[in-house]
Amino acid sequence: MAVLRQLALLLWKNYTLQKRKVLVTVLELFLPLLFSGILIWLRLKIQSENVPNATIYPGQSIQELPLFFTFPPPGDTWELAYIPSHSDAAKTVTETVRRALVINMRVRGFPSEKDFEDYIRYDNCSSSVLAAVVFEHPFNHSKEPLPLAVKYHLRFSYTRRNYMWTQTGSFFLKETEGWHTTSLFPLFPNPGPREPTSPDGGEPGYIREGFLAVQHAVDRAIMEYHADAATRQLFQRLTVTIKRFPYPPFIADPFLVAIQYQLPLLLLLSFTYTALTIARAVVQEKERRLKEYMRMMGLSSWLHWSAWFLLFFLFLLIAASFMTLLFCVKVKPNVAVLSRSDPSLVLAFLLCFAISTISFSFMVSTFFSKANMAAAFGGFLYFFTYIPYFFVAPRYNWMTLSQKLCSCLLSNVAMAMGAQLIGKFEAKGMGIQWRDLLSPVNVDDDFCFGQVLGMLLLDSVLYGLVTWYMEAVFPGQFGVPQPWYFFIMPSYWCGKPRAVAGKEEEDSDPEKALRNEYFEAEPEDLVAGIKIKHLSKVFRVGNKDRAAVRDLNLNLYEGQITVLLGHNGAGKTTTLSMLTGLFPPTSGRAYISGYEISQDMVQIRKSLGLCPQHDILFDNLTVAEHLYFYAQLKGLSRQKCPEEVKQMLHIIGLEDKWNSRSRFLSGGMRRKLSIGIALIAGSKVLILDEPTSGMDAISRRAIWDLLQRQKSDRTIVLTTHFMDEADLLGDRIAIMAKGELQCCGSSLFLKQKYGAGYHMTLVKEPHCNPEDISQLVHHHVPNATLESSAGAELSFILPRESTHRFEGLFAKLEKKQKELGIASFGASITTMEEVFLRVGKLVDSSMDIQAIQLPALQYQHERRASDWAVDSNLCGAMDPSDGIGALIEEERTAVKLNTGLALHCQQFWAMFLKKAAYSWREWKMVAAQVLVPLTCVTLALLAINYSSELFDDPMLRLTLGEYGRTVVPFSVPGTSQLGQQLSEHLKDALQAEGQEPREVLGDLEEFLIFRASVEGGGFNERCLVAASFRDVGERTVVNALFNNQAYHSPATALAVVDNLLFKLLCGPHASIVVSNFPQPRSALQAAKDQFNEGRKGFDIALNLLFAMAFLASTFSILAVSERAVQAKHVQFVSGVHVASFWLSALLWDLISFLIPSLLLLVVFKAFDVRAFTRDGHMADTLLLLLLYGWAIIPLMYLMNFFFLGAATAYTRLTIFNILSGIATFLMVTIMRIPAVKLEELSKTLDHVFLVLPNHCLGMAVSSFYENYETRRYCTSSEVAAHYCKKYNIQYQENFYAWSAPGVGRFVASMAASGCAYLILLFLIETNLLQRLRGILCALRRRRTLTELYTRMPVLPEDQDVADERTRILAPSPDSLLHTPLIIKELSKVYEQRVPLLAVDRLSLAVQKGECFGLLGFNGAGKTTTFKMLTGEESLTSGDAFVGGHRISSDVGKVRQRIGYCPQFDALLDHMTGREMLVMYARLRGIPERHIGACVENTLRGLLLEPHANKLVRTYSGGNKRKLSTGIALIGEPAVIFLDEPSTGMDPVARRLLWDTVARARESGKAIIITSHSMEECEALCTRLAIMVQGQFKCLGSPQHLKSKFGSGYSLRAKVQSEGQQEALEEFKAFVDLTFPGSVLEDEHQGMVHYHLPGRDLSWAKVFGILEKAKEKYGVDDYSVSQISLEQVFLSFAHLQPPTAEEGR
């Protein structure tokens, strides 16, 4: 039951996701309909011709050779060969034949057939040999007579000599050479009579090639040999004629020709997009870790696959139903695409194919971990498995049943063979019916439709098994692999024996032995929710083992939040991954709720809530749907779900967002939702990996409150990079370093162990004497130490144990402040950050934290000194420049940046190398670019050559027995005595052979017409020959009738009659068995298989187009990726010119395209494709390919603007290329078949499609080939030239002629469209189109702004903000040039249904050497402001100036002066850190000789040197932020924008970043920074503003804002554990009484956190009161610090509406 519930839930999830992806869903349903629509459209356009009367054919004489053979062959006489030459009987018979055939001819004998074949093959004499008569008797000596039962075969020329030119559109009806002796019926049957205009039956030419004349002459000669006189006498009164069966009224329908060839390909194309989508959707869940996350939540793997299967099956069922409807619905009276087939069987076939397609895509998905690659290779493999059909189709008749079945192991080949069978049954006039399921289409074939369906289902099972195995053994980056032999392990099938829960409780606690001073005693009254014992994890990197976690022992308790800290790479995430079952541990154990992780993961997952570091959300599910889905997945009943979801929405504060899709949520909201998912359904154990990363202060607070409220009955473990978060939330804090646990305890415990105590910072006046102050401090606190004395700042460390002495010290300092020359002083407690840094330093002494006290920390001390100032008025501005700054300034001025042409060349080179690096690193894709076209074309050529290399035709017995049991009608009109005699013999002979003679009393031809009308297609297989015997005057005419639907019926009919005459003359034992065994091809003929290769050009073009569809799409991948991650924007901000950016890409891509193009020429040469390689045409072929590259690459660049992700772009562009190439090419080509009668429409469409490079390539390649072969044929001989003229076969001497079949128009259009697409690309990139639109919208915008301003509530403006505005709006031209950044009344309105004012009239000036902080809640407008200032977004009104240049009109010059670090890392994964910095240095114009030093300095400053040569994709989040900042700083831009630069960094990395930024500031840069970390703003910013609703609400230095908007202190205290509760209540009452208005912020485990208000409280007073309370209330420890900037920030929270989205 639970399984069904989970399945239903997954189906609901998949269906909902699919429903929201409207375009994908529409395409999945639309493409099959489109291709079905093409067939319907053709069906409507192709007129079928009704032939209302029966077709009667005249009789044909076989007494003499056709007229053609009366002319001698070139320079010779005809030869009649016989074998064996040593037999007199054979020679006698042959001479008799020569005399009978009355043409000038000589007889030549050969000892054996081998001699004859050598003569034909190598002496090039086949043209003069009329035929060879080979007697199949040993003839032991020359006089041995011919037996009565004669067997012989005739060997005529393989190439027909007297064939009429038939132009039925050689693309589809490939007129093969030869006698078709491999088959009895055509491979593709025709509706109506075969060759309706040929009374002699046409192909293979039994009458017109003289075969029947020779056969009859040989038969008569054999009769004469055995009964000379009787034979002459018989033939004096008897004439044998041959006549074609009449054909009943029929509808001539050329459409059925097209469908037999094209239905397989159209079905393949119909499902191609779905195949790509399936692979992409499945892999995307794997790539985003959603699949593994669902598994952690308790989902079975087979259920996951089943749900996907059912969803896609449902969609394909709908598509297949519509296709069946379109195929079988009558579009005209009695006319449909498939007029006669059973719709239910067609649907069954399509569904079997759909199932195999889904299974195939599942199988492909298991080989990839990136959705892009899965889609790319999936599409290629999907088509690749169709290519073998090109081999199978031409040699279908040669293949055995087992070979056919084996080829059906590829589902696309099985589908093609099934579609071919449907076409054949349609053409037979019967259609496919359920009764035909196990019947072949004709006697030639042993393969039936039921076998196709069976093989499609078998394929699905086999693909499923591969999927199951691959997923188990190679689960991808985030799964746990099984051993390769897992399927033979009993434990896999039966499960492991359950470990007894609770058993581990008894184990001795190994941590006790290890307890040392850095591990606080564990709480004894709490239950351990998680127990970790000796846990280790070793990863194999290359050929080395790397320990990520070493021997970890830790207990995590219920009702507590345990915080796990560690710098990037310390082993935190690995530990959590082991606990959640993502990785198996290498050794050790862990128990969660009593269950062991490696054995009982299924049980554990039921109570496990997980919030990973990355948001594991489905883009298109709403907030409520996520909660509903995961609650049900964890096992909550459906009835309880709505209430639980409602409650959770309330808990996480997303009630108003319940119906918003997750992709529209801000980062903070996404994290809240992730936490909600972890909490829902009563999870007892919560594992939260950096739950608040990327949130603003207010959202973070909300999460903290949420976790504090939820922890009571849960075990919560969380990791974070925010030390204040660890301090505030952590009941116990564990710090890891290098994979080992270093310490564990409460925040106060760790501060006692590692912390120095209080930092007291004093700001000195000029007359201050540090010695006096030092004496005073040491007098009151003897063990105080001087921390630093730098510039105007003096800093002491006061030990915690001396807090009782602080009151006296502070009182003395306040009293003697002026006398000692102290401007201000303050104190701050050891922070958690210092503890963390100290632990890191102890572990790794090489990373000396003291060495990192660069300007950032010094400046922070300066800030602190003024922050805790007793008298804020005394705080003056400080000169930021010092020695380091001066040094950097000097270095900068020494380097002169490139400009003009030198800069453009340098930028072009940088962009070119970027593309080169991409190709080098993504070598698999480059390999695919080369191999896909080569493989497709090579396989096509192999298939074509294989089909035309053609085996020599085998021997075929011309007897009725070959056709099984048949009916032979005969009639004897009148009272002919000889006729009666003959008919009796005929009956006996046929019955002896197992045939069914049937006497017809009326007119034989009328009978045949009637039976054919009644029986339809079956008649042609059951009735092949007939005979009539009638007297005409004195003679009896024996008329042998043949059914021309079978190839060999003329000779078979004649053989029946001649046998009859032989039996009449020589008795019942006489018989003649004749066979047709065509001569082998001569070397000349093999070389001359020409003209009728029209389809070869078509096949090459089709395969080339398919390959190019995949190849061309790859050119968009980097463009889309760069745009998606904003790397392109950062490159433009760094000054790259549009032309350098795109033309360098175009040049590289053309070079990349040249390689497969040249290799294609090699392939053409290897296969000797004459049209493309001979007569100087190699250059033409290369030109065609390169012009295609020139046209398609800019088109792919243009299309990149439509997509947000590389995977989506790749799949959709591949489909676009297939549609714009193959579909249009097929449409035009099919219409060009003369029989279809749509030539004019095909010309019109051909002209319309000229704008599509794919279409041009297909048509050009096909036309070029066709023109070459036609021209070669028509100029090969006078006879050929005569034929070409007679049948109006056109060709062009000039291959580049404009009209068909010249390729001039395709060449010109590809050349022109390449230019057009490039121009359009530049228009878009240079914003010219946007500017035009902007001018048009300007009037409307002014109106919108005015309306918005009047609608907005007028909020009071802060005085500092008003003063800044006044100063900026005052006219002062000098300030424009000397101020790095000036913002004047900047506004941004987003045009939507309700216009949104995102930025509202900002005015600001940022000076040199200033770091300006832009603070605000998510949605306040910070990121929008950045986007406008960097030129990514247009300005609605106002303006901004960088170095005097307007952003609105001179964005190019502005960008050369700014550096930009966006909020999300705009990095290129395929480059190393060093390569990226070098690239940006070149973009900035740093001369090449200085780049190395400049990059080294940046790497050193950011401590990125160890990672400089690693690929960016391997960087941790922190290192990526460092690199992004380095990119912004390189090249010394005047203005630097940093959007949340330190997100995701650990404290050490963050400090280093601050140092770098501080150095840049001190060198005179203007820096604008946004951050969620108030600590960062205090450390770096000289001024800051807080934004609310797009406006500045306050502006000034951090201390100014704290003094203006904040007051009071923050108090934390911990009460002793004995009698804790009682003492705690008393202490709380004391605080409330002593500090009126105090607010209790937090309370847990005897710990309290208060906010103490009041500006009049002095440090001395606070410490005095608390020291007295310490003894009285049993306070173990306490700490006091001044209110933080964060609290000032939070005081503005109520002004920001909660619904505003991030990024505005």
UniProtKB/Swiss-Prot annotation:
Its EC number is 7.6.2.1, 7.6.2.2. It catalyses: ATP + H2O + xenobioticSide 1 = ADP + phosphate + xenobioticSide 2; a 1,2-diacyl-sn-glycero-3-phosphocholine(in) + ATP + H2O = a 1,2-diacyl-sn-glycero-3-phosphocholine(out) + ADP + phosphate + H(+); ATP + H2O + phospholipidSide 1 = ADP + phosphate + phospholipidSide 2; 1,2-dihexadecanoyl-sn-glycero-3-phosphocholine(in) + ATP + H2O = 1,2-dihexadecanoyl-sn-glycero-3-phosphocholine(out) + ADP + phosphate + H(+). It comes from Homo sapiens. InterPro entries: AAA+_ATPase, ABC2_TM, ABC_transporter-like_ATP-bd, ABC_transporter-like_CS, ABCA, P-loop_NTPase, R2_ABCA1-4-like. Changing residue 215 to K: In SMDP3; loss of lamellar bodies membrane location; loss of proteolytic cleavage; increases cellular free cholesterol and phosphatidylcholine transport; loss of vesicles formation; increases free cholesterol induced cell death; loss of protein oligomerization. This is Phospholipid-transporting ATPase ABCA3. Induction: Up-regulated in Leishmania Viannia (L.V.) panamensis-infected macrophages exposed to miltefosine. Down-regulated by L.V.panamensis infection. Glycans are attached at residues 14, 53, 124, 140, 620, 783. ATP 1 binds at residues 566-573. Belongs to the ABC transporter superfamily. ABCA family. Changing residue 101 to P: In SMDP3; loss of intracellular vesicle membrane location; loss of proteolytic cleavage; does not affect N-glycosylation; loss of ATP hydrolysis activity; decreases ATP binding in vitro. Changing residue 982 to P: In SMDP3; loss of intracellular vesicle membrane location; loss of proteolytic cleavage; does not affect N-glycosylation. Multifunctional polypeptide with two homologous halves, each containing a hydrophobic membrane-anchoring domain and an ATP binding cassette (ABC) domain. Changing residue 288 to K: In SMDP3; uncertain significance; does not affect protein oligomerization.
